[in-house]
């Protein structure tokens, strides 16, 4: 869990991910509480997997995404179509994905203002 929503602890994600790499371990992070509220760049943080839920940054409920680093070795457990780059068969809710995308753009565009509000409080 990157950010704990109850006690506010923020895990030093990059440091922990680098430790995992040192020992050859794969790392998954629950970033549900941090994406859209905290600057994250998965090209600089070596996590292998991360989970995100759109409703946590004012996006539609019932949609999210899984970050899966190329070369992680994860393979599909559900056979079928080639959706989700062959990782998950099924029809994507395009309207919900579009809503999530827009909500995430708006959340990151307003990140500085949200930080000011938090500092004020």
Where in the sequence are the language-model features?
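Pyridoxal 5′-phosphate
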Residues: 1-121
């Amino acid at each position: 869990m990157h950010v704990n929503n109850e006690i506010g602890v923020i895990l030093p994600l990059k440091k922990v991910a680098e430790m995992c790499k040192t020992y050859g371990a794969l790392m998954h992070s629950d970033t549900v509480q941090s994406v859209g509220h905290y600057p994250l760049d998965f090209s600089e943080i070596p996590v292998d997997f991360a989970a995100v839920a759109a409703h946590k940054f004012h996006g539609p409920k019932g949609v999210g995404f899984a970050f899966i680093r190329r070369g992680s070795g994860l393979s599909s457990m559900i056979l079928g179509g080639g959706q989700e780059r062959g990782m998950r068969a099924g029809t994507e809710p395009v309207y919900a994905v579009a809503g999530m995308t827009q909500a995430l753009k708006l959340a990151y565009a307003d990140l500085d203002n949200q930080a000011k509000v938090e500092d004020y409080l």
